[in-house]
Curated annotation (Swiss-Prot):
Organism: Schizosaccharomyces pombe (strain 972 / ATCC 24843) (Fission yeast)
Keyword Nucleus tagged: yes
The protein, known as: GID complex subunit 8
Chief location bin: nucleus
Lineage top rank: taxon: Eukaryota
Length: 240
């Protein structure tokens, strides 16, 4: 858990007076440990790690916390997607949220596309280029993905790129095609499923901790884009 913390600031700035003012301002900001613990607990719940959330809450002595229902089921669905068991994930998803795939076309398309990628992976990695193996991929794409693609240009482009995997030998794949077949696609779709389930349940779909991290990155990029030199600081906290 997060216990007593100290903040050491190291800076680089345009002038000594600016640096001193910045250090004075940062040291005047009080960060309560309970707020930090709340951010961590919120992150664990959003990520679906119920056991870790409960353990952390107990160690941090947080009593007034809320863990939404079906966290384990949500985590199980995400883990199935990450392992490539797309059919099982879809079945579990339909059991948990029966209407989600009817109302969320992006999630439906991405899950079906990932299933197609798993079929293509069998052809590519096992070097099974038989007519039967390729036909299985083509039939799946025709029956499940082709009806969705015309309604969305992004879907159409994605499907065309995916089908290109069957048109070239793996040794000649471009970086874009290699990325399509990368296992990181599973992680990406699992994250999409996690967010979609949370939205469907009326819950927050991004942890406050990640929001702060993303905001910090955005500020850094904006400063760089506008050629603004920002004073850097490195927090050092003692964790107990």
């Amino acid at each position: 858990m997060v216990g007593t913390s100290s903040l050491d600031i190291s800076m680089s700035g345009s002038s000594s007076s600016d640096a001193e003012q910045w250090e004075k301002q940062t040291k005047s900001v009080h960060i309560d440990n309970s707020d930090v613990n709340s951010l961590i607990l919120d992150y664990l719940v959003i990520q679906g790690d119920e056991e870790a959330a409960k353990t952390f809450a107990e160690e941090a002595q947080i009593t007034d916390y809320y863990i939404p229902p079906y966290v384990k089921e949500r985590l199980e669905i995400c883990e199935l997607i990450k392992s490539g068991s797309i059919n099982s994930a879809i079945c579990k998803l339909n059991e948990l949220e029966p209407e989600i795939l009817d109302t969320n076309s992006e999630l439906l398309f991405e899950l079906l596309r990932l299933r197609l990628l798993e079929l293509i992976r069998e052809v590519v990695e096992e070097k099974d280029t038989s007519d039967l193996a390729v036909e299985r991929c083509l039939n799946f794409a025709h029956e499940n993905l082709a009806p969705l693609a015309p309604s969305n240009q992004k879907f159409l482009n994605s499907l065309e790129l995916t089908m290109s995997l069957l048109c070239f030998p793996p040794s000649s794949y471009s970086p874009a095609l290699k990325n399509v077949l990368n296992y990181s696609q599973r992680e990406r779709v699992a994250n999409l499923a996690n967010v979609s389930i949370l939205k469907s349940q009326g819950l927050s779909n991004e942890s406050r901790l990640l929001s702060l991290v993303n905001f910090e990155r955005w500020c850094e990029k904006e400063a760089q884009r506008n050629s603004i030199e920002v004073q850097k600081f490195v927090p050092k906290a003692s964790i107990k």
